[in-house]
């Protein structure tokens, strides 16, 4: 995976949305967006995989992965421009894809504040937390 973008003091709370705009690198077979407490504790691992034509969402606690949730709605491709919105709610995350389709993923770890954001495989043009 190409270089990563990281924020370690995010302060995202329920009711807030993260809006990401960027371009997927041309030479990747997947990209990722992680939200959580740190590298080892991820409340949301969002991972579109071009080589599998699927979007994988998961959690990681202490470096141990949970059960994958797979969605066969692939609206991404290498080199494409993307706009993704992730809304953090008490019990789940709503991810709005570039074509307007929404995915829901449960907040399995139950945290009410997220401190960590990382992204890979994307050239970020903007991100906004509101």
Swiss-Prot record:
- Transmembrane parts of this sequence: none
State the PROSITE patterns in the record: GALECTIN
Q: Which SMART domains match?
A: Gal-bind_lectin, GLECT
GO CC aspect terms? galectin complex
Q: Name one GO molecular function term.
A: carbohydrate binding
Q: Biological process (GO) annotations?
A: cell-cell adhesion; positive regulation of apoptotic process; positive regulation of inflammatory response; T cell homeostasis
Where is the Galectin domain positioned along the sequence?
A: 4-130
The keyword Cell inner membrane belongs to this UniProt entry's keyword annotation: no
Q: Indicate yes or no for the key word Flavoprotein.
A: no
UniProt keyword annotations, A-Z: Lectin
Q: What InterPro entries does this protein map onto? A: ConA-like_dom_sf, Galectin-like, Galectin_CRD
The entry describes its oligomerization and partners as: Homodimer.
Q: What is this protein called?
A: Galectin-2
Species per Swiss-Prot/TrEMBL record: Mus musculus (Mouse)
The encoding gene: Lgals2
């Amino acid at each position: 995976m190409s270089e990563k973008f990281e924020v370690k003091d995010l302060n995202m709370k329920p009711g807030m949305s993260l809006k990401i705009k960027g371009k997927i690198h041309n030479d990747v077979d997947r990209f990722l967006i992680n939200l959580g407490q740190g590298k080892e504790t991820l409340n949301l691992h969002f991972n579109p995989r071009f080589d599998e034509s699927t979007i994988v969402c998961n959690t990681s606690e202490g470096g141990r992965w949970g059960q994958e949730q797979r969605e066969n709605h692939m609206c991404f491709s290498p080199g494409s421009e993307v706009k993704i919105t992730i809304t953090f709610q008490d019990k789940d995350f709503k991810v709005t894809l570039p074509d307007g389709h929404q995915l829901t993923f449960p907040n399995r770890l139950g945290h009410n504040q997220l401190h960590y954001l990382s992204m890979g495989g994307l050239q970020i043009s903007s991100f906004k937390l509101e």
